[in-house]
Amino acid sequence: MSDRDDFRLDGRVALVSGAASGIGLECARALTLAGCSVMLSDLRDTEGQAVTDDINAAGGNAAYTHLDVTQEDQWVRAIVETLALFGGLDVLVNNAGIEIVAPLVDTLHADFRKVMCVNVDGVFLGCKHAVSAMRPGGKAGRGGSIVNLSSIAGKRGVSFLSAYGTSKGAVKLLTKDVAIECAQLGYGIRCNSVHPGVVLTGMADGFFEQHKALGVADTIQGVQAAFEAAHPMGHFGTTRDVANAVRFLASPASAWITGAELSVDGGWAAR
């Protein structure tokens, strides 16, 4: 096997949550380009099926299933469908998430709980059922890699993101707990987190709008300039930047990496 082959995922199977757009979609594309069969999942079925059709039209091997990550029975079904269609499960990308931008004193408890339910409970449930399938004796039983999407907000304090930052910090530590447990039990399952800075997606558009409303700057361009300056490299990231990191952590090239926090943030976390 060549060094280049270490980055391939031929014969492997992945499940990606929140895959109808943005980072999740780009992760699904990157994994299929590496030779992986991918089950895309999301709440937005029309968009999810459309992008799955696009991936297949481009030569990929992908399917789509509905998944509300807060519902345990839907995780069970999604993994059963993945196993039935593709014959295994080697990679889980826990990408689905939501964000609320608000001052602490204006954040409703119900909204805080909603963010935690999607961003933390969803990752917990995905890890739980993926590990059950991937571990020795499981329905897949050949080990694998779990990649959890956290954020720069899971490593650094950021104003107006008390709910989101708390949830992403929890994802960071849950990742380490899963990594250590799987390693000590000899499951052959690695678990790592990816921490993007600001990436230009539909979620980022809302992020900028909400910060403008909070008076961070008078214009959207001013808000963007303020956040762009937080990245020492001087520009925002792309979904491809994040997807390439996920592909690396999913591949044999990262075989001795588990419990790690991979920052994809133009240097923000290094400040």
Feature roles, as predicted:
Residues 2-6, 156, 233-235, 246-248, ...:
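Short C-terminal tail/terminal secondary-structure segment
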Residues 9-39:
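Canonical Rossmann dinucleotide-binding motif of NAD(H)/NADP(H)-dependent dehydrogenases/reductases
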Residues 103-104, 108-113, 227:
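Substrate-binding pocket helix/loop in short-chain dehydrogenase/reductase
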Residues 127, 167, 175:
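Active-site helix of classical SDR
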Residues 132, 180-184, 255:
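Alpha-helical segment proximal to the catalytic Tyr-Lys
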Residues 151:
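Residue(s) in the substrate-gating loop at a strand-loop-helix junction
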Residues 183, 188-190, 257-259:
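Short, small/polar-rich loop/turn modules that mediate ligand/substrate recognition or access, typified
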